[in-house]
A protein has these predicted regions:
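Acidic beta-strand-to-loop metal/phosphate-binding motif
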Residues: 100-107, 244
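N-terminal accessory/capping or targeting/presequence segment of soluble
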Residues: 1-95, 109, 113-242
Length: 244
């Protein structure tokens, strides 16, 4: 296991946290592009397509879909107790006493998932832990999708959205879905695993800003001039600019 359970457990004791949730998703709520970027796999050795690990101060649990219990037991059962993922909430409510903190990194969990637990006995708290920053180091080209496949070009889609939303100069629309961003911009990557560009975007009155892992992107000269590709970490400071 390339990620040490001991380091997570030390983090729990230092911060007086009882348990920590780790999912297979990345910050775009997508599965990793390849196995080398899979944090859950590096922690548990589990190679299935979905799962959630919980490391507590004294136990390790791996919650998986019922289809994967045999596989998970074989791959991870030596160090993890395997439980069906649909029992996760019941397990937490029944197992842990009131006021025990369960932490998670809110970059990797959707709000509707976490909201299921806030009325339970345990306290769910967002608390990032410095897991390895596993990023794809291979550069990939971003290009404009051929017009025979996209139906409408970016300018026409952009105009339709502006007519529908009618943004003022000091307003913007945050887009969190990578698929929606790629549809609007007609951009794709040459990633062999998935052509969708993992990204978030801010749509302003006259421009679309796409925030992605810019260091690993080779930009095509054909990209529309109203589209700007920016570093993914810059989105936080840019969002603050629009706060009133």
């Amino acid at each position: 296991m390339q990620i040490k359970i001991k380091s997570i457990r030390n983090f729990l004791f230092r911060n007086k946290i009882y348990g920590y949730l780790i999912t297979k998703n990345d910050e775009y709520f997508k599965q990793p592009d390849n196995l080398n970027l899979d944090i859950l796999r590096k922690l548990t050795d589990f190679t299935g397509s979905f799962g959630i690990a919980m490391i507590t101060q004294d136990q390790n649990y791996l919650f998986v879909d019922g289809r994967y219990t045999t596989q998970a037991q074989k791959e991870s059962g030596r160090k993890f107790k395997i439980i069906k993922i649909d029992l996760l909430k019941k397990f937490i409510d029944n197992r842990f006493k009131k006021n025990k903190n369960i932490a998670y990194d809110d970059r990797f969990f959707q709000l509707n998932f976490i909201n299921r637990f806030y009325k339970g006995k345990s306290n769910f708290v967002p608390h990032p832990f410095s897991l390895p920053n596993l990023k794809n180091s291979n550069k990939t080209e971003v290009f404009e999708f051929d017009k025979k496949y996209h139906g409408l070009n970016f300018d026409k889609k952009f105009k339709k959205i502006k007519n529908l939303i009618k943004l003022n100069n000091d307003e913007a629309l945050l887009i969190s879905s990578s698929e929606n961003i790629c549809w609007l911009s007609n951009l794709r990557s040459k990633n062999v695993y998935n052509p969708i560009i993992k990204s978030k975007a801010i749509l302003k009155k006259n421009q679309l800003f796409i925030y992605c892992n810019i260091k690993n992107i080779k930009k095509s000269s054909r990209i529309n001039k109203k589209i700007r590709l920016l570093d993914e970490n810059k989105i936080f400071s840019d969002i603050k600019y629009f706060k009133k």
